[in-house]
Regions:
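Soluble non-cytosolic domains of exported or imported proteins
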Residues: 5-10, 34, 91-99
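Short, solvent-exposed turn/loop segments enriched in Gly/Ser/Thr/Pro and often Arg
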Residues: 24-41, 116-125
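Active-site-proximal N-terminal segment of extracellular/periplasmic enzymes that hydrolyze or transfer
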Residues: 1-22
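Second-shell loop/turn segments in exported
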Residues: 1-5, 28-30, 86-92
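Alpha-helix capping/hinge segments and adjacent helical runs
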Residues: 39-40, 44-49
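Extracellular/periplasmic catalytic domains that process cell-envelope and extracellular macromolecules
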Residues: 9-11, 19, 34-37, 107-110
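His/Asp/Glu-rich, glycine-adjacent segments
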Residues: 47-137
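Solvent-exposed, polar/charged alpha-helical surfaces in well-ordered, non-transmembrane soluble domains
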Residues: 13-17, 41, 99, 103, ...
């Protein structure tokens, strides 16, 4: 379902301004990592997965100090007692190596507010980056 189109008539204020923008219904990303986390991080940073640090939703890091070597794209594996396999992890943009659009907006104007809302933590974190004012998932 296209929720943006469905709820567009109800938008007011800043959200209504989205209707004045541009829509790319057949947008294309020139990289092979077609999972959510690398897709969101690529769109909101302008950098391909190899450069932005988010190569997949999950990958293995044999250098991790914990027994579980699987890494979730939006976790901080240095938080003790966490494991992506168990579902108990600390959400974090730790692996994101470049600034997001929100971070660049704030750098240009400190009055900018960065709000990231999505159905999953990885989408919120990859789209909002560091220093999110509000994050909901």
């Amino acid at each position: 379902a296209d929720l943006f189109t469905q709820y567009r008539p109800l938008f007011t204020g800043g959200l209504a301004r989205l209707s004045q923008g541009v829509v790319f219904p057949q947008g294309y990303q020139a990289h092979a990592a077609t999972e959510t986390c690398p897709g969101h991080s690529t769109i909101l940073t302008g950098a391909h997965p190899g450069n932005n640090g988010i190569i997949a939703n999950n990958w293995f890091d044999l250098g991790l100090a914990r027994e579980d070597k699987r890494v979730y794209c939006s976790e901080d594996p240095t938080v003790e007692g966490t494991s992506s396999a168990s579902g108990r992890y600390a959400p974090s943009p730790q692996y994101l190596r470049v600034p997001t659009l929100g971070e660049r907006m704030r750098a240009a104007d400190p009055r900018s507010r960065v709000v990231s809302i999505a159905g999953k933590d990885r989408a919120v974190i990859m789209m909002g980056g560091r220093g999110i004012d509000e994050s909901w998932w």
